[in-house]
Amino acid sequence: MKIADNTEHVCVSVKVWLCICSIGILLMVLVGGITRLTHSGLSITEWNPVIGIFPPVSEKEWIAEKMKYMSTPEFKCLNFNITFQEFKKLYLIEYFHRLLGRIVGLIFLLPFLYFTYKKKLNKNLIVNFIIICVLILFQGVMGWLMVKSGLIDRPHVSHYRLTAHLLLALLIFYLLWRQFLSAVILNVTCNLKINNTLIFYVISILIVIQITFGSLVAGLNAGLLHKTVPFLEGRFMLEDLLFMKPLWSNIFDNPITVQFIHEVIAVLILVIVSATLLILRLNFFPSYLLLVCLLIQLTFGILTFIYNVPIALASLHQVTAFILFAINTYLLHCVKLLKLQHVKFVS
């Protein structure tokens, strides 16, 4: 997918729309995290894209929904003592998550159709937005496939499908945010002591990998492990990191290994970002914003782990990862523009 270069003629309303859509994705990530952390995701056992807009109203409808839930592994194994009011609470959280997904989808689709009809979008933009539209539709399908994995024989969703669901949200967010940056920031006047984009590509890749392992940590409940993993009683527990067979399966299926990799990548990103700012002396506010956001993200992560994954901290930890990715994407965009403008880099 090629981001439109000819953005001088993008009207203000399109720019505002792209910004709103990007914020909408962040809100979806936040609400999705809350839905997972409150264990609400499996309370709605059917996928009804149209009639699912309407929640149960009468007592009879609520009883019917709970009867469906009572046939799920989650109810049979974990929530067999759940009260009717507790079920309603879980149901409404998941309902709001799905409703918000529909709203965000319409916020993207309806203005897109309007702007296309009014010929406010060039051909390249139209193609880009069609791709995003398809990805949004697929995200809805992916969300249901994730939920479905927890309705068969296990009281929890597949951590692979959970990760795919989050990464697809990241891809959609990236495409919207990148298109917004291309429409709004047409030139850069600052001086940066850097003449290539490699370092920011490396940081972007590491953030994506970190988000991937963060999702695996969530899906495997690795954040609830003992607080000194993988260092117990002053010794390195290699046997805990590599006990699964085949060995490579530890990378994705062993909670201790997944949590350890998540921690190592966090330190690696901190070292690279700090070194980039110190060595290159990037006198550019967004570069310092990147470091500040990273430190906040690390703080959220550490506190989330220490305090047994509280909902507020864990939700903020997840959405801050997307914000960190957005800031780095902004820096990458600025460096690319500087190269295109043939700006002479100075110390």
Curated annotation (Swiss-Prot):
Its EC number is 1.17.99.9. Heme binds at H262, H317. It is an enzyme of class 1 (oxidoreductase). Pathway: Porphyrin-containing compound metabolism; heme A biosynthesis; heme A from heme O: step 1/1. It is a multi-pass membrane protein. One of its GO terms (biological process) is heme A biosynthetic process. GO terms for cellular component: plasma membrane. Its cofactor is heme b. Its main location: membrane. It catalyses: Fe(II)-heme o + 2 A + H2O = Fe(II)-heme a + 2 AH2. One of its GO terms (molecular function) is metal ion binding. It is found in: Cell membrane. Keywords: Cell membrane, Heme biosynthesis, Iron, Membrane, Metal-binding, Oxidoreductase, Transmembrane, Transmembrane helix. It holds the Pfam family COX15-CtaA. It comes from the Bacteria. The chain crosses the membrane at residues 14-34, 95-115, 125-145, 166-186, 198-218, 260-280, 289-309, 311-331. Catalyzes the conversion of heme O to heme A by two successive hydroxylations of the methyl group at C8. The first hydroxylation forms heme I, the second hydroxylation results in an unstable dihydroxymethyl group, which spontaneously dehydrates, resulting in the formyl group of heme A. Interacts with CtaB. Belongs to the COX15/CtaA family. Type 2 subfamily. This is Heme A synthase. The lineage of its organism: Bacteria, Pseudomonadati, Pseudomonadota, Alphaproteobacteria, Rickettsiales.
